[in-house]
């Protein structure tokens, strides 16, 4: 519904930014690394995820598309809600992706609110899905490039 928000930071709270967007100010819950780098008066452009509950509308914001997609995957795991996913992302998106791919239960259980069973469930459910999310530090490869690279390698193997 709300794919993103751009505006000026009007307040930095303990777990959220207040972003001025036209005549509105919107509270956006964000991972701690994003909050640490935000300053009142600075411009932000956030990728967002809106969560609707019976008694609450919550907006979660991320600096890049990869962290947003990781957040969406994390909340798909039973036992991990939006606030828990933000706690996990506070460890850094790249570190979380690496932990899921390498099945590092110890890393995940070191995060507040994540027990051994939830960590194991997250690894089982997400280890294959996580490969489709490019880390924020590396650009996503275009599928055609991968197919082209494979074709070139095959031709070189045949002596062409």
Residue spans of the language-model regions?
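Structure-specific DNA junction-binding interface
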Residues: 1-76
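Signal for well-folded cores of large energy- and translation-related assemblies
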Residues: 10, 49, 75, 90-93, ...
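Mobile acidic interaction elements
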Residues: 62, 99, 110-111
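Glycine- and Gly-Pro-enriched alpha-helical subdomains that act as flexible
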Residues: 109-112, 122
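Strongly charged, low-complexity linkers/loops
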Residues: 122-160
């Amino acid at each position: 519904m709300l794919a993103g928000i751009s505006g000026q930071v009007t307040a930095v709270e303990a777990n959220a930014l207040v972003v001025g967007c036209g005549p509105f100010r919107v509270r956006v819950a964000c991972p701690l690394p994003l909050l640490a780098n935000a300053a009142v008066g600075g411009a932000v452009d956030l990728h967002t995820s809106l969560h609707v509950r019976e008694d609450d509308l919550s907006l979660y914001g991320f600096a890049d598309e990869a962290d947003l997609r990781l957040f969406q995957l994390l909340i798909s795991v039973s036992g991990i809600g939006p606030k828990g996913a933000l706690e996990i992302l506070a460890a850094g998106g790249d570190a979380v992706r690496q932990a899921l791919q390498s099945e590092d239960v110890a890393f995940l259980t070191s995060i507040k609110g994540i027990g051994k069973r939830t960590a194991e469930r997250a690894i089982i459910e997400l280890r294959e899905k996580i490969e489709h999310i490019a880390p924020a530090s590396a650009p996503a490869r275009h599928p055609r490039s991968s197919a082209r690279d494979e074709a070139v390698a095959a031709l070189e193997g045949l002596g062409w």
